[in-house]
């Protein structure tokens, strides 16, 4: 007799355990099991956040690796070290294959389970934003037609999320603010549209400021943190010393990504 499949509760507990141990690949596996077992039912807010945090950490490590390797590649190219450049390109390809696999995994899960089963506006925006995020991560390293396709898919997902967020969520809602933050980063980094990026970030910030007094205690910390990130990016993007600043553009960190 084969052992019984772990229950939904057991998988959630194991995901929390994996998070504590910083074993994020396994955390992803546990939360994917939860997402697949619920089928047509929605994930709870806690489950949704655990899934987001798991994937954010798994993808975050590779994105950081890719940036470091790409930076070294540029330096070696400028020095004319062709042998090193060839080795680096191969290694970068390995990281890109991992990035593609991770993004494909969560995007399939979003399309097959998470987006179709979401009914509440908050969860719809959350998952569509997530869909946009992972298409954006693909656009960061893809080139040519693949990059164009990833960018178009990002725009589509973010716009769908934005339509619902503007109609259904308060300007101070952390998910609406997180969407504005990441959407503006997409305009700036992927579409090279600083004006659009600044307009979107400024509008989101101004609208939230005007309704700050309506902010509930439970989301005050998350909302004000994202507002600070929006303001940081605006300062960076509008400054004349853009190139020299060297600051990393702020996007929703894993702390707020999972809200």
Swiss-Prot record:
Gene3D superfamilies registered for this protein in UniProt: 14-3-3 domain
Biological source species: Lilium longiflorum
Protein name listed in UniProt: 14-3-3-like protein
Range of residues in the leader sequence: none
Taxonomy, superkingdom: Eukaryota
Family recorded in the similarity comment: Belongs to the 14-3-3 family.
InterPro entries from the UniProt entry: 14-3-3, 14-3-3_CS, 14-3-3_dom_sf, 14-3-3_domain
